[in-house]
Amino acid sequence: MNVLIACEESQRVCKEFRRKGHQAFSCDMVKCSGGKPEWHIVDDIRCIMNGGLIRLQNQTKMVVDKWDLIIAHPPCTYLSNAATSRHSLTSTPLNKINGRTLSRIESMRLFMDIAMANCNKIAIENPVGIMNTAYRKPDQIIEPYYFAESEDDFENYTKKKLAYG
């Protein structure tokens, strides 16, 4: 199965799919930190998500007719509820709001471009935010405390994730 893991420079998910025998590739705007440049595409996901000629980080070129599965982790900086307060004049100057609003719109476009890719199986992960009202409700809500070590494990205890698929 041809698997594209979008917005993933760490290659953690990509490596697991490879371990299971799939032809998986990670894709991000930056070089990978996972140590497998032959499995990494440094490009905008929108340029390769519908298949075609791809160039891997190690400069190898190959053709992918179509992806069988796309899993995406688009940046949440402007999409999450944590970003919402930055769009309020009570806490942020107008010139910064304008810039953040443009960044939010671009982030929403990226999310929607991935959601509308020519692929039968698409999964998008993001925290609670604007997309569950601007797009639709998620198919699954993942509560991080299911995986937390303890209540003191703040990062893994409180940041609810949404899965669209």
Residue ranges and their predicted role:
Residues 2-53, 71, 78:
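SAM cofactor-binding core of SAM-dependent methyltransferases
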Residues 6, 37, 42-44, 48-67, ...:
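Class I S-adenosyl-L-methionine
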